[in-house]
Amino acid sequence: LVMAAFVQPTIGRISDRTKSSLGRRVPFIIWGSVFAALGLIGIRLAPNFGVLLAVWIFIQTNVNIAYGPGLALIRDCIPLDRIGMASSVKIMSDAAGAAVMIAVTGALIGETSGSLNWEWISLGILAFLMLVAISITSVQVSVRELRSTSDFESIAIKSSLYSVITPQLGLFLISRLVMITAIASFQTYGLFFLKDSVGLDNPAEALGRMILVIAGALAIAVYVSGWVSDKVGRKPVVMVGAIGAALSSLWMLTANDSTEVLVIASVIGGSVGVLLSANWALANELADEGQAGLHIGIINVATIAGAASAKLLGPGIDALNQIPGQPDDFGYHILIAGSAGFFMLGAILLMPLKTTGRSFVSKNRTPLP
């Protein structure tokens, strides 16, 4: 998390000012991806924890070198009236990639032997997919940027005179931080809530089913909300998602069995999907064309801070659970009520934001194939 918070804004800003035959972002995408792929070898060969930690830091650094400029490509290449759908595809691709690797690795465990064991094969598949993805991206983006080099250079020179941090962006960052904190709280403490508060006999199994349901609801909601946000604007869709997430979070406090948990979890998943898709589209809409790399890097700092904040809530939950005269799961009740409040706070903070509106279509863009 620390590496991502430092590397992404720094590399993003450098990429904004880069001029090369491959364009602004591609050199960093290639560098980061290639060295991250090479670093995967070190994971398997590391003889002790110290070496493994160093290898992991190396991989994380290079992943973030590629990731920040890669995310800026949405703002670089997609007209504003299609950013909603692009954001939906981005979120679904993230989830699908993770699901595929989990499924492949799970299938390989224990199925191979000898020098080519499941670890080498899994790492090899990951490296191969990474290199294939950056090859396709690099060719597509390089060709496109070469067609419009003069436009990008003039934008970068002009926009470098202005600061990225504005009151508008500040409100958005705080809003995103609190909503990501709420989302990450469910991911972090969901199993403990099911065990200690709902009282399920097999919380791990219930959580597994719940994840599948949430993933399905989230995927549908992400796709639909991206399309809708391109039609009606980002803020209304984010607010609908935030309100839905807040109400369904409070509804979870009434769950008494696995069936109720499953139903409520699907509503939470759908609401969070709506929120995430439109919120990421709004993040891109707020970006200055010439400083998308730095802008997205800063947005991701808020994302990282929200996820990290959720991890720090554990001791507070335990302390609240032990208050005399209160239920043993009092801490979880406060956590869920607080998460609902954070969803609402995030929506309220977005209300003063001025967006470009759905009628804007960039005139400086090459039509997409």
Where do the language-model regions lie?
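Multi-pass alpha-helical transporter architecture, strongest
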Residues: 44, 129-141, 332, 337-369
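C-terminal ends and interior cores of transmembrane alpha-helices
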Residues: 30-47, 243-256
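Glycine-rich segments within core transmembrane alpha-helices of 12-TM secondary carriers
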Residues: 4, 87-109, 300-311
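A membrane-interface helix-boundary motif in multi-pass transporters
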Residues: 109-127, 317-342
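Hydrophobic core of transmembrane alpha-helices in multi-pass small-molecule transporters
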Residues: 39-42, 49-66, 260-274
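Short amphipathic helix-loop junctions that connect adjacent transmembrane helices
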Residues: 188-205
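Intracellular juxtamembrane helix-capping segments at the cytosolic ends
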Residues: 65-78, 275-288
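Juxtamembrane intracellular "pre-TM" segments in multi-pass secondary transporters
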Residues: 143-174, 367-369
